[in-house]
Regions:
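Gram-negative outer-membrane beta-barrel domains
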Residues: 1-200
Length: 200
C-alpha cells in the first residue's frame, strides 16, 4: 500500500533559479584588503535522488547554474598603463553536489543540505576588463522546504551559503598593481525550483 511518504522516493529532474548576495575580498601580501559586495542572478538545472525511510528522507542532489554574480571595488589598483582601476570578481557558472537529509510531513519536506561547490572565479581590473580565471572547488550548506503540489511535481525554496575558497590574480596585464592578490568569493543564495520525480 502507498504510504504518505512514498511520493518522495526515486530520481528527479528540475529547474531552479534565484538571486545571490555575497562578498569578495582581495588581499596582496600585507597591504590593505579590499572587501566589496557581489550580487547577481542564477538559473539552471537540477538532478537528484531521494530515499525515504518512513518520514525521514536521505538524498543526493546536484545542480549547475548559469550565474551573473559579480562585484567590484572602485579605484583599488593601478593598471600597467598607469590608470586607476576597480578590482572586479565574477562567477559565470556555479555547480553544487550535495547530500540532503529531510523530514516529510505528508506533502511538505523540510531539509538541510551540504556538500561541494565548484565554478570558475574570474579576477581582474576594470579597465581593462580582462580577467584571470581560476576553477575552484569549495563548499555549500543550507536548508529548504519542498512541497509536492500535483502528482510527481514539487516546488521548493532554499537558502545556500557558498564558499568558493581563494582564487588568485596573477597576470600583470589583467591585475596591474594588484598582481599576486589572493581573492575570496562567498555567496548567500536564495533559490526557488520545480522538480519532477520519476516513480520507482
Amino acid at each position: 500500500a502507498n504510504g504518505p511518504y512514498t511520493n518522495w522516493a526515486g530520481a528527479y529532474l528540475g529547474l531552479n533559479g534565484g538571486f545571490g548576495l555575497g562578498s569578495s575580498q582581495w588581499t596582496l601580501g600585507l597591504m590593505a584588503t579590499d572587501v566589496f559586495n557581489t550580487n547577481g542572478f542564477l538559473f539552471g538545472g537540477t538532478v537528484g535522488f531521494n530515499y525515504p525511510v518512513s518520514a525521514v528522507l536521505f538524498g543526493l542532489e546536484a545542480d549547475v547554474d548559469w550565474s551573473s554574480l559579480n562585484g567590484s571595488a572602485g579605484t583599488c589598483a593601478v593598471t600597467t598603463a598607469g590608470a586607476t582601476a576597480a578590482c572586479e570578481s565574477k562567477n559565470n557558472l556555479l555547480g553544487t553536489a550535495r547530500g540532503r537529509v529531510g523530514y516529510a510531513l505528508d506533502r511538505t519536506l523540510i531539509y538541510v543540505t551540504g556538500g561541494a561547490a565548484f565554478g570558475p572565479v574570474q579576477t581582474g581590473l576594470n579597465p581593462p576588463a580582462t580577467f584571470d580565471t581560476t576553477t575552484k572547488v569549495g563548499w555549500a550548506a543550507g536548508a529548504g522546504v519542498e512541497f509536492a503540489f500535483f502528482g510527481n511535481w514539487s516546488a521548493k525554496a532554499e537558502y545556500l551559503f557558498v564558499d568558493l575558497g581563494s582564487a588568485s590574480c596573477t597576470t600583470a596585464a589583467n591585475c596591474g598593481s594588484a598582481t599576486g592578490s589572493s581573492v575570496t568569493l562567498t555567496e548567500n543564495l536564495v533559490r526557488g525550483g520545480v522538480n519532477y520525480r520519476f516513480s520507482w
